[in-house]
Amino acid sequence: MRHHTAFVLSLVATCLLGIMAGFFYAFAIDVAPAMANLDASAYITTQQWINRVVRNATFGATYFGSALLPLAAALAAFWCSQRRVGLAWLAIGLVYFAGVFWLTRTVNVPINDALATWQAASPPSDWAHARDNWNDANLVRTWVAMACFVAAVVLVAVTQGRTR
C-alpha cells in the first residue's frame, strides 16, 4: 500500500507540474508576444481581466498542488525507504518552489497588484517596464517549470522501470 501511495503521489505531482509548465509556456510564447503589440490602455485592460479570470478554484488547486505535491511525493518515497527517489523529489520540489512559486509571489504578484490599481485611460509612465519585468519573471518560471516537469517524468520512468 505504501508503494502504491508513493506511486500515485508521484504521478499526480508529475501531472500537475506538466499542467503548470504548459500554462506558463503558452503564456510565454503566445499571450505575452501578442500583448507586447498592445498600447498601454489595451494592455492594462487585458492584463487586468486575465488576472481576474485566473484566480479561480481550479487554477488555485493546480498552482498550489504543483508546489506541494512534489514534496508529498518526496515524503512518500522516504516513507517507502526509497531515499534516492525521495531526495530527487525533494530537489524537484525545492527548485520548483524557488523558481516558480517564490518568484511568482515576489515578482509577478506584486506587479499584478500594482497593475490592478492602474487606470487604462491614464497609464503610469513606467507601464512598459513593469510589463517587461513581469514577462522576464514569467520566462524564468516557464523554464524552471518545464525543467521540473521533465525531471519528474524521467524520475517516474526510471523508478518504475526498476520496480517492474
Locate each region found by the language model.
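Interfacial segments of alpha-helical transmembrane regions
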Residues: 2-18, 75-99
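Interfacial loop at the N-terminal end of multi-pass membrane proteins
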Residues: 8, 17-64, 110-132
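Internal alpha-helical transmembrane segments of multi-pass membrane proteins, especially GPCRs
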Residues: 11, 52, 91, 132, ...
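Hydrophobic residues within the alpha-helical transmembrane core of Major Facilitator Superfamily
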Residues: 18, 71, 98, 150-153
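Hydrophobic alpha-helical transmembrane segments
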Residues: 57-73, 131-148
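Hydrophobic alpha-helical transmembrane segments of integral membrane proteins
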Residues: 91-113
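Short, charged juxtamembrane terminal tails flanking transmembrane helices
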Residues: 158-164
